[in-house]
């Protein structure tokens, strides 16, 4: 009975390690890396992320935009 328990514990440990590796591999999947850059053309203080996002997408043709604590518009682009 003790041998059977040890074998089952080893199988369970291997099973857990396999799924841990599988989970971590998903986290580092094949996605394009994104970089956050200060907008070149946004004028004035950035008070609403909706305006910044619209500007980055439609005017600078980038992925998205967000206002940060420095009241400037930052755009996301692929690196």
UniProtKB/Swiss-Prot annotation:
Residues 1-32 form the signal peptide. One of its GO terms (biological process) is killing of cells of another organism. Pfam families: Gamma-thionin (PF00304). Belongs to the DEFL family. Keywords: Allergen, Antimicrobial, Defensin, Disulfide bond, Fungicide, Signal. It comes from the Eukaryota. PROSITE patterns: GAMMA_THIONIN. This is Defensin 2. Disulfide bonds join 35-79, 46-67, 52-73. Probably has antifungal activity. Not glycosylated. May form dimers. SMART domains: Knot1.
């Amino acid at each position: 009975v003790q041998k059977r328990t040890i074998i089952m514990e080893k199988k369970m440990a291997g099973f857990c390690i396999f799924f841990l590796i599988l989970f971590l591999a998903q986290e580092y999947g094949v996605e394009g890396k994104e970089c956050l850059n200060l907008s070149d053309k946004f004028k004035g203080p950035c008070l609403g992320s909706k305006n910044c996002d619209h500007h980055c997408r439609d005017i600078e043709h980038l992925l998205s935009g967000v206002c940060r604590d420095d009241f400037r518009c930052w755009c996301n682009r692929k690196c």
